[in-house]
Amino acid sequence: MKLLHLFTTASILLLMATCSKKDSPAPSPTPTLPGCASIISPVGGSFVTSTSVVLTWSGVTGASTYDVYLGTSSSPTTAIATAVNGTTYTHTIPSTPNITYYWYVIPKNTAGAATSCSATERTFTYIVINAPASLGYYVVGYFPSYRSLADVPDIKFRMTNVVVYSFYQVNASGSLVAPSSPVASLTAVATKAKSNNAKILLGINDGSGDGKTNFKNMASTQSGRTNFIKQVMNVVRSQQLHGVDVDWEFPSTSDGSDITFTSLIKELSDSLHRDAAYYLSCAVTAGKYAGGIRDAIRNEIFPVVDFFNIMAYDDFSTSTPYRHHSDYTLATVCLNYWLTTRDMPAAKAVLGLPGYGRPSGITQSNTVLSYRSILSQGGNSQLDSAVVSSGGFSNYTIYYNGQYTIKRKAKLAKDIAGGIMLWEKWQDAPDGNSLLKAACDTVGRSY
């Protein structure tokens, strides 16, 4: 009886053990340890201009969530977000500019295990891009490197609030070329401008024979634009200038340079306007004639340029007599086009004035005279034409702007635009017949 009991008990235990082995689930496999994510953006020492930064990375096989680390020193140890589903995370950074941030992502599997991924760290810098403060009514005067500073008294610098040193030239690769033998150096003109409370801008034009090929070639590639902007910023900073004037004559829709001009101006503006540090101006065509040249100035650059020097002159003819190259009517036509037709902000439209005269119906070679030279030959400061002799031509009529017309144009610009520009300072009369004096007196600018 005892033997039967023992046998029965053993059978039951064996059966229970057998059932237990069949009913127990197999152990779960260990989750795969995920690799590191590739940082997508922001990356590579890039700049961001918003305090709301979208951090983006690649998905990783075996990762169920991601922890995001960010800080202001390398290999940050503080996670700004944990268990993030997906591959983006928006983070708000402080509004203090010029701070560099370091960041990386740690993918985690379902068990919460991860690989150290700090080696994938990338950086970005928060910057502020804003235009510097407007100067109000602009009175811009160009000063060519081939003129003598001794011939232009301090008062002429006080009459202007912007002086443009003209010109450095650009070559096809984007390098800047300073004047080889300047009568007046950039440093000397900058010193005189600053001592008379004027901003000093570096004027840049094209070093090629046609005045546009080097700009066109440089701007056609990202490397060319980058090199150009780097060189521009080096000169602006080293010479302690207040900005840059771009004098590309002219980009055009006919060859696609309008597209690369737009890219160049936007990229240059971003560099100059960082921390609202420097001004950017552009010389633009008068706008009287329809076509690819005036259409090349796209409206999308209006917000990124501080002011436009509208070249409302040189509308001459070598075959038709009695034609003024820059009368009052041309000024109204130009401003109407840029302000009304094109919607250029009025405060940024600067009306160009000529400090020289041109003949009509004959060659322009050696017959163009400065305003001061016209007066020295008996021209009247209150009129717009005179009989002069020059370049082998005797007693021909030259057309210029006297004080009366300059006053009218200055008032027009005061009423509907943002200021005036004179090409160029040396050509003006040094005394009471000065065109700049007439303009300043008209608009109430003290000097």
Report residues per predicted region.
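Extracellular fibronectin type III
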Residues: 109-128
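Substrate-binding surface in catalytic domains of secreted glycosidases
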Residues: 140, 172-184, 230, 250-379
